[in-house]
Amino acid sequence: AQSLTKMAKLALALALAPAVTAFAPVAAPKAATKVDASIADTLATMEGPEIFWGSDGVLLGHDEADIKGYDNFDQLAAALSKEGVDLSGGEYTLLAPANSAFDKHNNEVGTPITADVLKYHVIEGKKTMDALNTDQKTLNGGTLTAYRKFRKNWLDGAIIGLKSEGPSKSSNWPSDVECDNGIIQAIDTVLVPGAYAGER
């Protein structure tokens, strides 16, 4: 009889559960995250693409595709500060070469990184990756040539938002990084005004 009473109580509780929850207060929606970091602040803390061990890691017990660390944007941040390129005054899209892109430029091209070169990486207004499919006017007065190749958007020979495709040593480059005064698109190449003479 006692077990029957327990079963009856359980059945009653289960029957009343939907009625009780029907009158429970609805959870408040989560507040939208406020974007309150400037382009400069975001650039200083933004993690870049993966750096893989490659063949150098094999002798150390690493697979070639193991991640060794992450690229970053220290050299770009330092160059902007040194050359006095201030991006705090409006909404901009910054095409941001990572440190590896600066190293490649210094080793293979060698032209100085001037304010004019840096402004060639800046477009007025917030432009998402999808909006960069047409030629773009830059802050230095030049024009970046846009084209589509290998199902990717390119500007002057730089891929916008390069993403890894499968289990390989290809890296993911940050794209559409929102800031309170603009947006950052990481690129794998330092852009030089007037240097691009390739395809559209």
Predicted feature residues:
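N-terminal chloroplast transit peptides
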Residues: 1, 8-28
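Low-complexity, disordered terminal segments
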Residues: 1-3, 86
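Terminal low-complexity, poorly structured segments
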Residues: 6-12, 39, 114
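Mature, structured domains of secreted/extracytosolic soluble proteins
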Residues: 25-200
